[in-house]
Amino acid sequence: MSASDPQEFSGKRVLVTGGTEGAGKAIADRFLKGGATVAITARSAPAEGTPAHYIQADLSTSEGTAHVIREILGRFKGVDIIVHNVGGSSAPTGGFITVTDPLWQQAMDENLYPAVRLDRGLLPSMIEHGSGVIVHISSIQRTLPLYDSTMAYAAAKAALTNYSKALSNEVSPKGIRVLTVSPGFIETDAATRMIQRMADGDKIDYSAARQKLMDMLGGIPLGRPNRPEEVAELVAFAASDRATAITGTEIVIDGGTVPIV
């Protein structure tokens, strides 16, 4: 494997969904550093001065994904790399009984359907050019589901991972690599908000809720959560020409959380 070229993404058009904060921002910044033209999507605008092209959209809706597809095809004439990072959970604590039908639907709308809809709209141009990379950001919760706060999220990520594998089987022979990156606990603002919800629901302090989450995951042998920049570096490698034989698989970055090999 050759070393990373500082401008390895020069000339590449990259779309990062959920790219204004957390791991998504770190991923977008990494591609920008590598010389790519980067478009990011989110409901809220990024910090002023970002060099990425911002497309405001709610990807949990079909209208939002249709808008992004029009913008990408119209402004950039297609895309070379898609990183489906958007997703998350806003379900309350309390376990299974608290997850209503609307919350189950919301989990799918936020964690599965954006990827399906965007792939449907943007893959044809990739296939026409005979090349491209699609990275779906899943989660280790697809195999280590937690019942408190993220049950529906975990199920949606399991669906995303299986969808990604099926899609790779179809389009890899056409020159399109499709793979999944599944992080464990990432120390982001969104994770902080989720931990605070757990703390409020259990009437404990933040540090106790953070430790509870780590314990629920079975512990992190590395001793700490992932950093957004570490996830971004893995995604950049997976999308680069250093990984041209990697498709149809899941790459886990979790500090050793998953207890099996």
Regions found by a protein language model. Name each.
Residues 2-6, 93, 224, 235-236, ...:
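Short C-terminal tail/terminal secondary-structure segment
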Residues 124, 169-170, 244:
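Alpha-helical segment proximal to the catalytic Tyr-Lys
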Residues 135-159, 164-173, 185-186:
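Catalytic loop of short-chain dehydrogenase/reductase
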Residues 208, 219-231:
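A conserved structural motif in NAD(P)-dependent oxidoreductases
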Residues 13, 20-21:
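Conserved glycine-rich cofactor-binding loop
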